[in-house]
Amino acid sequence: MVVLMDMNTNEYDIRLSRGHVLIDGGEGLLLVDTGSPMSFHELGRIRLCGGEYSVPESLPGAGADYVSGKVGERVAGLVGMDILGPLGARIDIPGGKLILQPSTEGTAPVPSGVSGLGYVFADMTVAGRPARVILDTGAPVSYISPSFTEGLVPVDHVTDFNPMVPGDTFETPVFEIPSSFAGRDFQMRAGHLPGFFTGMLSMLGVDGVVGMEIFGRMPVVLADGEVRA
């Protein structure tokens, strides 16, 4: 349920912590996570852009204490696509701003869509091949199907976390892969998700999960069920 309030702020300063996108929601820091279909807050509500949204106090395996420990800042909640999708959002990490209910002026649509589960899909090119990925601001490390890295030599190894993984952490090699999104070419650094995650993505017709490798390079607008850049 949404209760209208006398709050008209739709622009928020972004701060990064360990590659995670945080904003001050007025009742504690919020992790901005387009890869999460659901939001939560330890107070059971999130107040943004003139509205109050009733949300659970935690998600399975992930509450405020868990997220705080992973991102390195005291976080009160997470704002996901159940709020960001209907509002629309311009996520401008290079400019340091999150704008809700944004204008789409000066942007062009990217082949994309939002699934019934709340995930944001977009098309890009990886290693000269078309790839459909989930756009996830909650992913400091990006991931791509191993089929896109065949023959490549890792340039790094990293440890990442996910509450669905036994022990909640996993290691992955990282590769540099020629990629393109919204007409912009770049070298994407991406690893491999644990096998069962790759299988789940394959069932959704998805080749990977991309976060800061795109969001850190350009403003991205989510509006009216599409992605624009």
PLM regions and their residue ranges:
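Pepsin/retropepsin-fold aspartyl endopeptidases
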Residues: 1-229
